[in-house]
Amino acid sequence: MKFTATFLMMFIFVLMVEPGECGWGSIFKHGRHAAKHIGHAAVNHYLGEQQDLDKRAVDEDPNVIVFE
């Protein structure tokens, strides 16, 4: 019961604090900035793998017959 009451009080406190107080705005701004970089890194990593797979699919096409 104590844990629940403490959790609720902390939750209410966090909701009531304005973004300008205690540097919350700065923390949220840096968090958004970090999330944006992580998202871009994930997309770039996925696209790099996709290009490798596309290249491999063209190089290893089983329908192409090559006589050497």
UniProtKB/Swiss-Prot annotation:
Please state what the protein is called. Answer: Pleurocidin-like peptide WF4
User: What exactly does this protein do?
Assistant: Antimicrobial peptide.
Task: Give the principal location in a single coarse category.
Answer: secreted
Q: Which GO terms describe its cellular component?
A: extracellular region
Superkingdom is Eukaryota
Q: Which residues belong to the propeptide?
A: 48-68
Q: Supply one GO BP term.
A: defense response to bacterium
| Listed InterPro entries | Antimicrobial12 (IPR012515)
Q: Where in the cell is it found?
A: Secreted
Give the signal peptide, or none. Answer: 1-22
Q: Name one Pfam family in it.
A: Antimicrobial12
